[in-house]
C-alpha cells in the first residue's frame, strides 16, 4: 500500500504507546501500576462542569469563529495581562483543539521546507515530529543533568545558522520539570532578538511551579514579544485534558495565518468546551492550590525514594509533574535473561516483570532516563516505587 514519505518519517509517541500497553493490561485484569500519561488525576472543578452544562442548555452548540469565540479570546487576553503582564488583542489569540494543535498550527505558520527548529533535549516527544510534519528540520540541542537540563544562551547561539527559524522553549519542562529563571530567559531572548529567531514558548505547565515562579519569555522585552508564539491551554492547570482546549498568542499576522490553517483543518474547537474554559479562566483558583499542594508532596516523596535506590538517581524538578530517573548505571546489566541496553529495554522489562509502566526517554532525546509522572495517587507512587526497587535489586 502506498504511504507518503512524510508519513513514514513520523515516529509513534512512546508516551502513548506505553500508556496503551498499561491500559490494555489493566483491562485484562492485571495488577499493573502506571506512571505514563501526563494527566492530572484530579477531576475538573465543578464550576467548570456547571458552565458547560449551562452552555448546552442555552443552546451554545453551533459553530463558532475558527479562532474561537470572542468571549473566550478576550478572557485569554485578560489572563495574559493579569498573570503575565502581556498586552494582546483578541485577534492575536487562536483557540485550538488542545495545546498540541496550537503547536502544529504554529509550525505550519512559520516554517518553509528545510527550515530548522532548535529543540533542547530532553524534549517532549511530539516536538520533532510536529516540525517534520511542517517540512521543517528538528535540530536537537543537548543539555546535561549536571546543568539541570537547561541550555545556555551561548549554546543556543552556537546552534544557529542561516536555516534556523525557531527555538522551542518549554518551561516548566516536560519531561525534566525544570524552570528557567528570568535572568536565563533574558540571555536567551537577547540571542533570539539579535538573530531574528522565533521562540515557540510552550507554557502549558506555568501554574505547576513549586519553587520560584514561571516567567514568559514574551515578557522579557517588546522585541522578544514580537518574536514569540505563546502556547498554553487548560488541560494541566484545571484538570481538563479531555476537553481539548489550547490557545496561542502571537503577533497578529501569524495569528491570522494560524487561524486560516485551522479553518481548513478542524474549523472551531468544541463550543461547549470553549464556554467551560471561559469559566475556568474567570473563576476561582482554589482548586489549583489544592492540586499544587498534592503534587508537591508527591514529588518530594518520589524524589527521596528514588534517590535511596542503589543504581538510579534523579534531580528534584521545580515544576510540571514529572521526574526523570537516571538509569545509565543499569545499562549492561541483566534482569533474568534480558539484557538492559536502553531505556526501552528497561521500561519493557519493568512492565513485563514488575507490572510498572514508566516512559522510556529514547523518544525524548536522551536514552539514559525513564520518566515518572506523579500525577497519580500517593498509594500508587508508594507501590510503584516498591516494585521498581525490588526489580532493580534483581538486576545483575
Regions found by a protein language model. Give the residues of each.
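Conserved nucleotide-sugar phosphate-binding/catalytic loop shared by glycosyltransferases and other
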Residues: 58
Amino acid at each position: 500500500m502506498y504511504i507518503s514519505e512524510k508519513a513514514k518519517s513520523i515516529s509513534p509517541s512512546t508516551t502513548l504507546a506505553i500508556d496503551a500497553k498499561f491500559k490494555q493490561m489493566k483491562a485484562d485484569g492485571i495488577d499493573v501500576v502506571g506512571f505514563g500519561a501526563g494527566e492530572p488525576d484530579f477531576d475538573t472543578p465543578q464550576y467548570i462542569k456547571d458552565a458547560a452544562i449551562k452552555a448546552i442548555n442555552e443552546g451554545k452548540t453551533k459553530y463558532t469563529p475558527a479562532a474561537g469565540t470572542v468571549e473566550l479570546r478576550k478572557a485569554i487576553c485578560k489572563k495574559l495581562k493579569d498573570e503575565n503582564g502581556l498586552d494582546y488583542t483578541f485577534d492575536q489569540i487562536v483557540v485550538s483543539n488542545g495545546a498540541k494543535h496550537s503547536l502544529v498550527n504554529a509550525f505550519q505558520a512559520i516554517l518553509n521546507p528545510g527550515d530548522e527548529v532548535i529543540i533542547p533535549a530532553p524534549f517532549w516527544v511530539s516536538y520533532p515530529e510536529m516540525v517534520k510534519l511542517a517540512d521543517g528540520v528538528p535540530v536537537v540541542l543537548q543539555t546535561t543533568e549536571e546543568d539541570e537540563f537547561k541550555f545556555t544562551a551561548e549554546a543556543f547561539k552556537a546552534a544557529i545558522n542561516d536555516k534556523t527559524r525557531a527555538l522551542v522553549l518549554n518551561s516548566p519542562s516536560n519531561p525534566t520539570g525544570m524552570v528557567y529563571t528570568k535572568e536565563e530567559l533574558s540571555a536567551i531572548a537577547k540571542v533570539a532578538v539579535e538573530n531574528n529567531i522565533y521562540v515557540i514558548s510552550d507554557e502549558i505547565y506555568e501554574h505547576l511551579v513549586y519553587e520560584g515562579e514561571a516567567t514568559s519569555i514574551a515578557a522579557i522585552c517588546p522585541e522578544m514579544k514580537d518574536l514569540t508564539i505563546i502556547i498554553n491551554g487548560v488541560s494541566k492547570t484545571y484538570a481538563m485534558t479531555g476537553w481539548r482546549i489550547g490557545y496561542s498568542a502571537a503577533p497578529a499576522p501569524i495569528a491570522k495565518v494560524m487561524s486560516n490553517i485551522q479553518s481548513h483543518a478542524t474549523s472551531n474547537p468544541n463550543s461547549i468546551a470553549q464556554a467551560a474554559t471561559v469559566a475556568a479562566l474567570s473563576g476561582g483558583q482554589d482548586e489549583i492550590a489544592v492540586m499544587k499542594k498534592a503534587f508537591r508532596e508527591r514529588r518530594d516523596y518520589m524524589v527521596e525514594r528514588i534517590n535511596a535506590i542503589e543504581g538510579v538517581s534523579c534531580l528534584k524538578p521545580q515544576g510540571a509533574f514529572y521526574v526523570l530517573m537516571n538509569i545509565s548505571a543499569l545499562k549492561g546489566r541483566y534482569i533474568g535473561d534480558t539484557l538492559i541496553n536502553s531505556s526501552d529495554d528497561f521500561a519493557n522489562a519493568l512492565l513485563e516483570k514488575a507490572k510498572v509502566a514508566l516512559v522510556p526517554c529514547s523518544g525524548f532525546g536522551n536514552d539514559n532516563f525513564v520518566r515518572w509522572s506523579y500525577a497519580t495517587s500517593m498509594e500508587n507512587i508508594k507501590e510503584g516505587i516498591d516494585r521498581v526497587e525490588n526489580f532493580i535489586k534483581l538486576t545483575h
